[in-house]
C-alpha cells in the first residue's frame, strides 16, 4: 500500500512550511527545512525550492510508508487507505507505530485511542501535538472512500500550532 495524495496533504498541513530556508525549532539538535525534513544534512543558511521541499517530503515519507506496510503485513491488520494515511503521518512524526500496535496485540480501535497519548515533548503536553493526534485519530476512524449511500467522507483539519519543540509553547 502507498500513501494517498490526501495523506501527503495531511502531513504537509501538520508539518507546516514549506520552510525554504533552514531553521531551528526551539532547542532541537538539528535544523529543519521543507515539510519537516530534519537532520544533520540540513545546514544553517541552506535554501531549497518548493519543488525540492516536495521531493524531500516524498523521500522522507517513504521510510514511514515502509514501516507501516511492515506492521500491516506482519500482524495482518488489513488497514484501509485512511488508516494507512493516518499511521503514516504518525510514523513520519514520531518515527514508529510499534508503540500503538504493541506487536500486533491491539485492535484497531485501541490503536486509534492510543494515538492521543503521544502529545508531549520533553514531558510537556503541546497543543499542536494534541491537535495533530486528534486529527490523525479522526482520519484513522473515518471511512475510506464512499459510504453505502455513495457519500464521500472527508475531514477538515484545524492547524492550531505547528513546529513546536521543547521550550516553545
Residue ranges and their predicted role:
Residues 59-98:
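Active-site nucleophile-His-acid catalytic modules used for acyl/amide transfer and hydrolysis
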